[in-house]
Curated annotation (Swiss-Prot):
Residues 50-137 are annotated as: Disordered. Belongs to the TRAFAC class translation factor GTPase superfamily. Classic translation factor GTPase family. IF-2 subfamily. GO terms for cellular component: cytosol. Residues 102-118 have a biased composition (Basic residues). It is found in: Cytoplasm. Keywords: Cytoplasm, GTP-binding, Initiation factor, Nucleotide-binding, Protein biosynthesis. Pfam families: EF-G_D2, GTP_EFTU, IF-2, IF2_N. Residues 226-233 are annotated as: G1. It comes from the Bacteria. This is Translation initiation factor IF-2. Residues 362-364 are annotated as: G5. The keyword Protein biosynthesis applies. InterPro entries: EF-G-like_DII (IPR053905), IF2_II (IPR044145), IF2_N (IPR006847), P-loop_NTPase (IPR027417), Small_GTP-bd (IPR005225), T_Tr_GTP-bd_dom (IPR000795), TF_IF2_bacterial-like (IPR000178), TIF_IF2 (IPR015760).
Amino acid sequence: MAKMRVYEYAKAINVSSKDIIAALKDMNIEVNNHMAMIEENAIKQLDQKFKKSAKPAGNKKDAGTGGQKPQQEAAKLNAGSKPNKNRDGKKNNVQNTQFNNKNKKKNNNNKKNKRGKNHQSPQEKQFKPKKELPEKIEFTNSMSVGALAEELGKEPSEIIKKLMLLGIMATINQDLDKDTVELIASEYGVEVEEVIVHEETEFEKYEEPDNEEDLEIRPPVVTIMGHVDHGKTTLLDSIRKTKVVEGEAGGITQHIGAYQIEENGKKITFLDTPGHAAFTTMRARGAEVTDITILVVAADDGVMPQTVEAINHAKAAEVPIIVAVNKIDKPTANPDRVMQELTEHGLVPEAWGGETIFVPLSALSGEGIDELIEMILLVSEVEELKANPNRRAKGTVIEAELDKGKGSVATLLVQNGTLHVGDPIVVGNTFGRVRAMVNDVGRRVKSAGPSTPVEITGLNEVPNAGDQFLVFKDEKTARSVGEARATKQLEEQRSDKAKLSLDDLFEQIKQGDVKEINLVVKADVQGSVEALAAALQKIEVEGVRVKIIHTGVGAITESDIILASASNAIVIGFNVRPDGNAKSTAEAENVDIRLHRIIYKVIDEIEAAMKGMLDPEYEEKVIGMVEVRQTFKVSKIGTIAGGYVTEGTITRDSGIRLIRDGVVIFEGEVDVLKRFKDDVKEVSQGYECGITIKKYNDIREGDMIEAYVMQEIERK
């Protein structure tokens, strides 16, 4: 009997690779993964083990577990009863404390707990100091001075004194931000843990927890990535042609951005996404869609820039990579070179002692496709991909568009649960009821389980690719959550557009022909306010004007920040500081505060920002001329011009024009600039140099190269 790989032996005796690996480890035989080789003597031992356990194992197990399970459970209950009491007691205490704190906060803020006059006042009951300091306190969105005092077991007056020493004037009911709470807590050596509270609009609030026993194995979701022209599309088409069409007789294949194939009763979902941009966009929106990445590398071309980019994307998403070495049927194919180059990027082939699976194939002829699919199934088995089909569906949008006949159409990938026709659904910031579902071969279906791509209609608007979706119990809840999410997004967009700072004035959107900066000016005395306002309004920059919407004497207050936020303004403070509330509000509202002590520095800063706000004007300046005296043709580089600088200088980052007989025949950029064998940044008049022009090779002796730069005209 010859040696066999783990997965081959597992396949032969119809047992999973994981069971074989576990059995080998029990026999003290070390194996790393399903691709490891098994020696002959080990195969014999495995044969004996699995043949012996084939029939009687089930009966023994049943007999054993049948009698023992109730006893074990009873023992566990008896053993764990005492500690659980203590734990439950502690939990109840913590919950009671938190509940009391919440009630007390509500009483302090006079918002919700208006139950009557018989209650004791908060000051009488709330602030009984505790003896011991806690190790850790929890912080949600904010915490009042009184609540912080109670958490720390201190008198509120003590906390207020400490805040005064930090320059923060606060009352007992005033809310503190996280930084301030951490500062005060650190004074007592107490840690602050931030607790994230899910809002009504967040899907996490409506998530159903899955029990381990409800989870079932689901098909893997595979994305194919790689460099342009390395055969991604051909590979997808080849898999679709050999597996989808033959398996779906009479089915009309339509493009919905994803499709499924079936091999030996097991399904695989392929995402037909347009390259890395869509992959990255989905990840940026929090959509971890892909389970396995197929990295396509052409055997005749090797690793290219987009290949490296694809590797980095897959690694950042922590997704296993299978390398498909394509175009092996070409005469110039060199798979070993591909392996060598990928090793430099951390993808070491199994044949060389690594963990990355390499599959040589030809997408054009179909050679190696079956082996690739087998490897995908093996990796998915090792990854243990599971989902619960008996719950309300959740997943991700793959594609979405507005169809003239159907309205809003979205391709969804169900990641957990089962989606049914008629389900009330929220998709991103849109909502609706699933009116119709079409699978990847154009057939109408009534339900779709985990890892299944379907095209649905029935949404009120078009969602974005990468948006999450969740099915709700009723249409009323779905509508309210969908509308709330849409409103929240609109507010965020307005907030993002409205907030102006001096740093990002260059990127601000033009509002008609007039551009203006709104300012709120605060100073220590009225004279300074008037002088500063007058000086700012005298700034004369073409096309931009200063609009002072509010002036005042004294510290920058919360009302100043709210006004600035509503008016898209920048706050200027002269010899004054913002108070604690103003700081926290400015951070929350993203309002830019600029503090100065010298008037001319305020003027200079605003003037510079206003100049940057204008569209820059440029003029061309010729910096040098080069005469081409000789040309050299080099393979893989192109034509090198041996030149002599007749005027000025030529630099590596300058623009160039190639002039022949007084006519400009090409305008572009310098690719390489050398003096002898060294790369140089510039070459001056009277020196020789070697030049290559980016994406242009028709250079002849006698040509003139004119070097120029674009200079920004300074506004006056």
